[in-house]
């Protein structure tokens, strides 16, 4: 507890955090101006004025008791609970008569802005049990359908328990309940076209040992913030539209291990949190308006399921990955998520074969956790707005496609394993990313440039276990690697992809099965070919420029005898080809700058080459040039 007994006016722009109780006394004004407060305690204003000068300064999880003092609203803000002299007030907006608030009070508020209060005081309720005593008459308003033939009060103070008998209840007139509880150990429907208003009791269903389905087709109105607590092995389908009452939108929380399915285009505006179990949506408007975001607490076992073909504009807040369960999954169809996505912890998104999940609203992160992409044989795509998760890893480790079709992305490392990462525009990969292909439990992986040049800071393997690892492009495209570390790369180059190695490190190629028609270039550091590695039979362009070194460890490193090798002009000693002992690499032509060199053998002074040139060659092996200056190529056998 902190008591601020001040008779002067001061401003505090620092951060308030935790469950502190702050008591403002004295005749002065204390102004709060920090927008990043995470305060979850209570303010008590017993005298003077507590002023808000920045939205968010009070903290959305805080409580406020105006117990003799006033709140000045220079900007609008929101809190969880409001008290007048210790008595909690209902959810709504508050302010002076100069404001647009629902509840106006000049004795407690000054300024022209409003205070939004999210939570109402607890409501006293009674429970009534449905026994279906009226037989075929299933009307909710028939007394014989309730235990002791006594109707519940339909004024929002009754918890309706559908528990002892029957399979259906019908809402024939507009009805208000504290909440609905499904205790019936059989499937049950609540039907009708009249609105059913739910208060703080929300919806609940107990755990079952076998599957049970409860269906509500009548429209629902959310009167207050509430929890839908659905037990294990239970599915509650809501097919009527869901709206809320005017004022501050109520908050909605899905808990329990069971499932809620939303089938209608809904208009509720409050925030929705999936904290446990699953919530399935079957259309783009199921999550209500975009005024309130949907939060998925994967860390607690919450998961959002998408079923159908639609576009959703809902803002999403995603975080947590309990036991690699995932928190967002496309079950069937093709869905586009066009709203902004905020990552607050590791996030795993999933789909399956024949399905496409597309993110077009952009993704932002706080530096905490992986973005795990699990297509499961399908496609997960990112387009229109970028992924901006600095320091976090894009972790793609299943079969199928991860498609990047937007530029200006920012993340840390990139893992490609199991499937294909496809680049649908130039420069979609962050140039600072480390590209890792394969991982021990999924050693294969493909990077597909798809005709678009890309740049990465490092190219490496996540495992040396056998696997099908490839970098490809059906049409010409270049992967530039600014490699300052040294890595051995067992990766095939296929299609028409080219590799440009820069950076001070050494990149060693060991794969014997490359088939690309693209070229290989080195401008800094070392590009090495060793073991059974080769540029492949279709590569005809090899370039060694700048301060780069091409290290060739065996005679078939450049397999195409019609290949053209380009190096700096004569006398320029910055770039070199290193030829290991016993190596005789045969190529078509050799250029020093624009000068075509004559046929013959070339090497360093320690080689047995005809043309010894220490400015361009090192090692004791030799390079045999088969083509003469006239363009004739002579193949030696």
What are these regions (language model features)?
Residues 34:
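Short Cys/His-rich zinc-binding micro-motifs
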Residues 106-113, 615, 629-637:
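Enriched but not universal
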Residues 122-134, 628-637:
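Short, composition-biased motifs enriched in small/polar/acidic residues
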């Amino acid at each position: 507890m902190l008591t601020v007994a001040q008779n002067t006016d001061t401003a505090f722009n620092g951060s308030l955090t935790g469950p502190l109780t702050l008591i403002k006394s004295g005749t002065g004004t204390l102004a709060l101006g920090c927008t990043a407060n995470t305060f979850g305690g209570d303010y008590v204003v017993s005298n003077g004025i507590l002023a808000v000068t920045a939205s968010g300064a009070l903290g959305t999880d805080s409580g406020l008791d105006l117990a003799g003092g006033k709140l000045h609203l220079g900007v609008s803000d929101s809190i969880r609970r409001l008290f007048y002299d210790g008595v909690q007030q209902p959810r709504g907006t508050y302010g002076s008569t100069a404001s647009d608030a629902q509840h106006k009070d000049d004795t407690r508020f000054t300024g022209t802005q409003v205070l939004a209060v999210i939570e109402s005081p607890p409501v006293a309720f009674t429970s009534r049990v449905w026994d279906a005593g009226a037989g075929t008459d299933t009307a909710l308003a028939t007394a014989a359908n309730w235990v002791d033939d006594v109707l519940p009060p339909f004024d929002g103070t009754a918890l309706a328990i559908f528990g002892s008998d029957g399979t259906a209840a019908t809402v024939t007139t507009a009805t208000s309940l504290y909440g609905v509880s499904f205790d019936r150990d059989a499937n049950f429907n609540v039907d009708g076209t009249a609105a059913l208003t739910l208060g703080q009791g929300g919806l609940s269903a107990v755990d079952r040992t076998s599957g049970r389905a409860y269906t509500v087709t009548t429209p629902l109105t959310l009167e207050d913030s509430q929890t839908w607590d659905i037990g294990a092995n239970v599915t509650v389908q809501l097919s009527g539209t869901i709206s809320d009452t005017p004022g501050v939108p109520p908050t909605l929380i899905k808990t329990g291990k069971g499932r809620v399915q939303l089938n209608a285009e809904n208009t509720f505006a409050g925030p929705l949190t999936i904290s446990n179990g699953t919530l399935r949506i079957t259309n783009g408007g199921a999550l209500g308006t975009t005024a309130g975001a949907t939060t998925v607490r994967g860390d607690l076992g919450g998961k959002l399921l998408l079923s159908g073909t639609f576009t959703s504009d809902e803002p999403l807040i995603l975080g947590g990955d309990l036991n690699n369960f995932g928190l967002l999954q496309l079950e069937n169809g093709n869905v586009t998520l066009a709203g902004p996505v905020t990552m607050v912890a590791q996030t795993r998104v999933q789909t399956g074969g024949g399905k496409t999940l597309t993110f077009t609203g952009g993704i932002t992160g706080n530096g905490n956790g992986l973005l795990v992409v699990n297509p499961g044989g399908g496609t997960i795509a990112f387009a229109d707005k970028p992924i901006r998760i600095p320091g976090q890893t894009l972790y793609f480790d299943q079969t199928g496609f991860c498609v990047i079709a937007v530029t200006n992305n920012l993340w840390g490392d990139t893992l490609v394993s199991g499937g294909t990462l496809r680049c649908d525009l130039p420069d979609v990969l962050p140039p600072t990313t480390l590209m890792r292909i394969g991982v021990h439990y999924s050693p294969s992986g493909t990077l597909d440039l798809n005709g678009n040049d890309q740049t990465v800071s490092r190219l490496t393997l996540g495992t040396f276990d056998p696997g099908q690892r490839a970098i490809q492009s059906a049409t010409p495209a270049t992967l530039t690697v600014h490699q300052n570390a040294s890595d051995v790369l067992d990766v095939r180059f296929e299609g028409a992809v080219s590799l440009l190695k820069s950076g001070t490190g050494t990149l060693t190629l060991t794969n014997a099965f490359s088939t690309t028609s693209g070229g290989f270039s080195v401008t800094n550091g070392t590009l090495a070919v060793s073991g059974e590695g080769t540029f492949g039979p279709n590569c005809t362009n090899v370039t060694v420029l700048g301060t780069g070194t091409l290290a060739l460890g065996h005679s078939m490193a450049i397999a195409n005898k019609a290949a053209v090798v380009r190096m700096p002009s004569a006398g320029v000693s910055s770039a070199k080809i290193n030829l290991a002992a016993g190596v005789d690499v045969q190529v078509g032509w050799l250029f020093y700058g624009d000068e075509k060199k004559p046929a013959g053998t070339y090497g360093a002074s320690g080689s047995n080459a005809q043309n010894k040139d220490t400015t361009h060659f090192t090692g004791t092996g030799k390079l045999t040039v088969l083509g003469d200056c006239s363009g004739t190529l002579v193949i030696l056998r």
